[in-house]
Design a protein with these regions (language model features):
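Conserved S-adenosyl-L-methionine
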Residues: 169-181, 198-206
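A short His-aromatic
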Residues: 106-110
Length: 280
């Protein structure tokens, strides 16, 4: 099932994509900070992330710039501890020091008012609150690929992004995220987070390679001492085991439909060549 959202910029339930794994993994990280807290999910989109965090948060607000999106989110997610409101990153409709945690995933690259956004988020965040934000690293996401995302107004290089957050928050923890399609073999009896060995290759040669560059940077920031959950000290993997199988099945289905359609129409093409003169 594909989303009704063809741009891929906003994840919706029903999406089957790399973005699905990336976004859900980020929300799983955020969940570690939200237990019994007041939480803000800024640029919440259709609200799936707000809903996920609501299962752990005391209260949660989802804010989005698009009014119709907010209306639909209210209808779709109606838990007692959830509310949705219209607003943007420079004008959040809540009083000062409202939230224990603010989450903002893949938002800052969609505009150029970066200082205004962080200033506004800091306003609604409690003095000892935690801010969790992510954005693609321009070098890996754009420069290395040679392709620009037309929906991104101002991407940041990793150092620029980290420096921006550090101007507003005294304590930060930096995480890197990379989508990987591959096979993961681990030692079942190991109790430590041992260094990983990465391999790459083909049918002719398999060899050790460097760890992939993180495509996205996630920063956890606070002006209070950061208490990092034990699980965050470990590397984590989001597994969608049927991801490739589902895509393969979908494309096979499309291919079969094409072949059947071609077979049905082929006799008509032959007759057309016989009976229809050129120019008719």
């Amino acid at each position: 099932m594909f989303s009704k959202n063809p741009t891929g910029e906003r994840l919706e339930q029903g999406d089957l994509s790399q973005g699905m794994a990336e976004h859900l993994h980020r929300y799983k990280i955020a969940e570690m900070f939200c237990s019994d807290k007041s939480v803000l999910d800024i640029a919440c989109g259709e609200g799936y992330g707000t809903n996920l965090l609501s299962k752990f948060a005391k209260t949660i607000a989802g804010v989005d710039i698009d009014n119709q999106t907010v209306v639909e989110a209210k209808l779709k997610y109606s838990a007692e501890n959830i509310q949705f409101a219209q607003g943007d990153t420079s004008n959040i409709p809540f009083p000062d020091s409202t939230f224990d945690v603010v989450v903002s995933f893949e938002t800052i690259e969609h505009h150029d008012k970066h200082d205004e956004m962080i200033t506004e988020i800091k306003r609604v965040l409690k003095p000892d609150g935690v801010f969790i934000i992510s954005t693609p690293d321009k070098y890996v996401y754009t420069d290395l690929k040679g392709v620009k995302n037309k929906f991104h107004v101002k991407e940041l290089y990793k150092k620029e992004f980290i420096d921006l957050i550090k101007r507003f928050f005294s304590n930060t923890t930096i995480l890197n995220q990379k989508f990987i399609t591959g096979s993961y073999i681990y030692n079942e009896s190991s109790t430590t987070n041992s260094p990983k060995i990465w391999y790459s290759g083909n049918f002719n040669k398999v060899e050790q390679t460097a760890r992939p560059e993180g495509e996205y940077t996630i920063v956890i920031a606070s002006n209070a001492a950061l208490t990092i959950p034990p699980d965050l000290e470990k590397e984590s993997f989001f597994i969608e085991s049927n991801f490739i199988d589902k895509l393969t099945a979908q494309f096979k289905s499309l291919s079969i439909r094409y072949k059947v359609g071609y077979a049905v129409l082929s006799p008509l093409r032959i007759l057309k060549k016989i009976f229809v003169k050129p120019g008719k």
